[in-house]
Amino acid sequence: EKYRKTTFKPKSIWDDNSFLTETGTIELRELGFEKQFDFPKPISLIKQCVELSTSDGDIVLDSFAGSGTTGHAVLKLNKETGVERKFIIVEMEEYAKTLTSERVRRAIKGVPKSSNFKDALGGSFSYFELGPTIEMESILQGKNLPSYEEFARYIFYTATGEEFNEKKINEKTGFI
């Protein structure tokens, strides 16, 4: 009973015009992207979803990031509310580098020529590409052996959870 008094119950139907995909298309254009993506979700829609379902310190996962609206919405919401949410966005298509990550960069830095996105939202992000799969069974059988650097990166990350810097390999000893 006590939780009913402290929680907000959203409307069942969201009919705000700012939630239309047309708005998402206009936003992408203002960010400097021509028609590269059909029916992108608008920032306001994703921002509303994130605001209703997360709080300070939460991590938002979007496994099908598309044009990167989720990352953009989280950055905008963080700036507006002063709350620190993080996000992980995943995109497997070719436009991940040219659209998805570039949109997040522009949101962070701002777009000087845009009237709505001139101001930088701040924040940071890391962009990663998947490398070839390292399967332990194949390694144990001596098949498809990765290079020393690839294997060192895998072992180092598995052991520490940190990114591996190949420059730290001692060429003479092979030690990290």
Which residues are covered by each model-predicted region?
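Residues that form or immediately flank small-molecule/cofactor binding pockets and catalytic motifs
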Residues: 18-19, 92, 132
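SAM-dependent methyltransferase catalytic region
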Residues: 104-176
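Short acidic (Asp/Glu) and glycine-rich catalytic loops that position anionic groups and cofactors
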Residues: 23-28, 82-88, 126-134
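Class I S-adenosyl-L-methionine
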Residues: 1-59, 86
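A generic structural signal for short, solvent-exposed coil/turn residues
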Residues: 5-6, 79-81, 119
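Generic alpha-helical structural element
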Residues: 3, 35, 89, 93-96, ...
